[in-house]
Amino acid sequence: MNRLGELWVLTTFGESHGAGIGCVLDGVPAGLRVDEEFLNLELSRRRPGQSLYSTPRKESDRVEILSGVMEGFTTGTPLAMFIPNENQKSSDYESIRSIFRPGHADFTYHYKYGLRDHRGGGRSSARETAARVAGGAVAKMFLKELGISIFSGVFQVGEHTSDVRDFAHARKSVVNALDPLMEELFKEEIEKARGAHDSIGGAIEVRAKGMPIGLGEPLYHKLDGALGGALMGLNAVKAVEIGEGLSAARLKGSENNDPLRLEGFKSNHAGGILGGISNGSELVARVYFKPTPSIFLPQETLNEEGDEVICALKGRHDPCVAIRGGVVCEALVALVLADMALLRLGNRLQDVKEFYGKGR
């Protein structure tokens, strides 16, 4: 499957070392103003090669809108976007053409499809996430019309974690650190891993502010279920928490429940979701990334002929994928919320009658 969503649908295409990466958005309402400057700004947040803490592969990541927009506004038809690949180095992968890289999708892709793209992993490369960010940027424009904003930051690198949530600082931080006092430590850990030809894991928190009540479907398309599915579909993500998440297992009901008052909920252990439906509180999710599997240390593995071999990778890779992962998580949350907002329409007969002029 290469698509996400029920009514607001994102379909992505392209490979890491192909002509480019792109997406098609279907279901975007007509009349939405498309801010191309914002679109490219979001892509620049994900763009590689901007610091010592990400892959040195340099891409301009300027998006070309192919269809679905006229005179700056969506037309209601499929919105197609394309991002050319400009800095591929496929020769870096020639020596491992038949070798399964440990921790990568090479082994599973090969046995599922009978072939695979050895050049940077093809569709399994994080390069594909540029298309998700492009689609998510349009979703953010739509959500802005509804008063919803989404933001994120890194709260953990390796064993070092922080409870501080300074999202304004994260937007200025080269490693997207939520805690100003932890920024240098995060940098040191990433530099240490890179210097040892290794990588390191990390975690981000993403929030949505201005949430309405009622987004999400009961049982089989819950908001938290949809968010978990979208976020777990992101490269290197190994766990997703909503609200208290794993910590809720250590609490009593009296500690975990959020008291409800006239002005709203007193706390937000639920992370903004009850019964799979948004409750109007801020949406809170945490996303945990494994260490980037592309490392330059010798590793034991197999080749396609079944021989045991030693693999030492070349190429250009992120030492900590969580650093650039935040903007992609924001995009996925935006896509899910945009879809849920459209699905929310028609939940009540009165709403349908009013839309068609029968409720008067």
From Swiss-Prot:
InterPro entries: Chorismate_synth, Chorismate_synth_AroC_sf, Chorismate_synthase_CS. It holds the Pfam family Chorismate_synt. The keyword Iron does not apply. Coiled coil: none annotated. It catalyses: 5-O-(1-carboxyvinyl)-3-phosphoshikimate = chorismate + phosphate. It is an enzyme of class 4 (lyase). Its EC number is 4.2.3.5. CDD domains: Chorismate_synthase. Keywords: Amino-acid biosynthesis, Aromatic amino acid biosynthesis, FAD, Flavoprotein, FMN, Lyase, NADP. Pathway: Metabolic intermediate biosynthesis; chorismate biosynthesis; chorismate from D-erythrose 4-phosphate and phosphoenolpyruvate: step 7/7. NADP(+) binds at residue 46. Reduced FMN (FMNH(2)). GO terms for cellular component: cytosol. GO terms for molecular function: chorismate synthase activity; FMN binding. FMN binds at residues 123-125, 235-236, 275, 290-294, 316. GO terms for biological process: amino acid biosynthetic process; aromatic amino acid family biosynthetic process; chorismate biosynthetic process. Gene3D superfamilies: Chorismate synthase AroC. Its cofactor is FMNH2. This reaction introduces a second double bond into the aromatic ring system. Belongs to the chorismate synthase family. Homotetramer. HAMAP family: Chorismate_synth. This is Chorismate synthase. It comes from Wolinella succinogenes (strain ATCC 29543 / DSM 1740 / CCUG 13145 / JCM 31913 / LMG 7466 / NCTC 11488 / FDC 602W) (Vibrio succinogenes).
